[in-house]
Amino acid sequence: SVAGRAQGM
């Protein structure tokens, strides 16, 4: 999801 991309995972 977008939440993972916010941390760069």
Swiss-Prot record:
Keywords: Antimicrobial, Plant defense, Secreted. This is Antimicrobial peptide 1. Monomer. One of its GO terms (biological process) is defense response to Gram-negative bacterium. It comes from Cocos nucifera. Disulfide bonds: none annotated. Coiled coil: none annotated. It comes from the Eukaryota. Has antimicrobial activity against Gram-positive bacteria B.subtilis (MIC=76 ug/ml) and S.aureus (MIC=80 ug/ml), and against Gram-negative bacteria E.coli (MIC=82 ug/ml) and P.aeruginosa (MIC=79 ug/ml). Found in the liquid endosperm contained in green fruit of coconut palms, also known as coconut water (at protein level). It is found in: Secreted, Extracellular space. GO terms for cellular component: extracellular space.
